[in-house]
Amino acid sequence: MVSQMVTIINPTGLHLRPAGLLCKEALRFQSSIKFEYGNTTANAKSVLSVLGACVKCGDEIELICEGADEKEALETITELINGGLGE
């Protein structure tokens, strides 16, 4: 298992478009990919789970990957989030 703290920089947080992009990228990996925000744990491979976490701009999440390709998954998803998730 690998994890990293990441700050959401999207002005409108994780709304539908960036949540969809995050999930699409997460689904490429075999590893379990989730994030923790406050008391919430969200499955990064589920748009509804990501949206349900209600993550806003400036919020810090802990991205957690576990599985065969966990390091690559963590690096890729972290880069995507740090790049603004297409916004």
Task: Briefly describe each language-model feature range.
Residues 1, 30, 85-87:
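A composition-driven signal for long, intrinsically disordered, charge-rich low-complexity tracts
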Residues 7-57:
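Compact, glycine-rich, soluble single-domain proteins
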Residues 52-87:
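C-terminal structural segments of small proteins and small subunits
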Residues 1-5, 60-62:
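Intrinsic-disorder/low-complexity, polar/charged segments enriched in Ser/Thr/Lys/Arg/Asp/Glu/Gln
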